[in-house]
Each structure stands twice: as C-alpha cells, then as structure tokens.
Amino acid sequence: MPACSDGLREDIFNELKSRKSDALSRYFDENPELKLYKYRSGAERDVNALKAGKVWMGCAAYMDDVYDSALIPKEDWLKLYQYMCSKEPKFKEDRYAQVMNSQGKMFQNELYICSLAETAQNEDLWARYAGHHSGFCIEYSANSLIHAGRVPFPIYYGDINRSLMELNAESKPDMLFDIILKKSAAEWCQQGEWRLIDWYSSLGITPGDKGILVDVPTPTKVYCGKNASAELKESLLSASACINIPVVFDA
C-alpha cells in the first residue's frame, strides 16, 4: 500500500482548511485496502482494549510533543504576561500567573486524539510506544473506521503560526486546522501519522480528563513484537481468538 506522500498530505490539509475533502476522499477511494496501525506497550489494559474492540482517545495536553495542538507558543504568552505585569503589578500574583499558564492549553484540554501510523514496520514507533518490540501493533482497516464514523486524517508537517495575539473571528476556523492537523517538529515527520479526532463534549467527558476508551471496528490483524513475553503472546492469542483475527509473531 503506497504511503500518503508529503505532497498529498499538504493538498489534503489545504483542502480541509478550505472546507473541502476531495483529495482525502479520492485517496480513500483509490486505496480501499488502506490499513492503519496502533502501537501498544503490551500492558494488560492494552490487551483488554483490543479484546473489547476499543481504542484510547487521549487528551492532547498529554501528547509527547508539548506543543502538539497547543493554541499559543510559550514565548507569546511570556511576552504578553510580562507586558501585563509592567502595566499592573498585581498580575505578578501567583493566581494570575496560574491562569495565564493554563490558557496556553485551552485547546489541548478540549481535544482528544488517537494516533495511528501507516505501517507496522516503523522502528521508531516500536521503540517509543511498543517497548522496543516487547509490545504489539494492531492493524485496522481505514475503510471500516470511516464507515463506523471514525474518519482518520493525515497529519501535515510544516511551519505553524497559531498565536493568540493574531487570533480573531476570521482566522479562528483556519487556525483550528493548524492546531489539530499540523506539526512542525521534524523529528515526528517519519511517523507518517494519521489521527482520529474528537472533542470532550462529544465523548461525554470533562476537559483535561486524560482520555477515554471508544468503540472501533474489529481490527484485521495483530503483530506481536519479537521481544514480547510468553505471557503477552498467550494473552494475544486468547484475545485474537475471541474476535477472530490472526496474530503475526516476531514483528
């Protein structure tokens, strides 16, 4: 299956900002067998979620990239806060500092994400999220996710400009796409990330909650890491038998 190229990711991103989805729809139509992958550590809760047909939607405030889905870069807040303190000394009080620091996470606390990858052979992802091949990787059909109302969106990597000091009524909708579907850090580029996205209100949780398990279609396959324990292998065999999917060992 061909990966979603950098150029296509940019085209999809720009179209979504223009309230279109032609490029994304075409990509799905041209790649009906597209598979996306979720890397898991191998903890008991991961196996239980697999067996129950669920994935974890995590709060963006707890992502590895501290600026992921953040509305305001730290330096913008610092300049604004310093200016306010120079004009009014009371803003130096702890209670104001706490409020200022929390505002930068406004969207992060409201946005919930499940990150997926384009391949089950990404060494960086096996290392980061699956315990250096001691965990496992779950394969999902993108088409099944779409039909279940969980549309995956590809992340676009480029320059980000999402400062509160430039936010107004006209720019806000476009900036939301920058916040949700764009990353700037080059170190994340090789992950080929796609995202399932939802808001706290749709999930029935409180902003800032760490996350929630949501229903997804039955996976198509599970890859068990080559360094997985005998206990995990047995657990995956049991779970996969319950949902009738194959397990590939020594991934």
Segment roles from a protein language model:
Residues 1-251:
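Partner-binding and oligomerization surfaces adjacent to conserved cores of proteins
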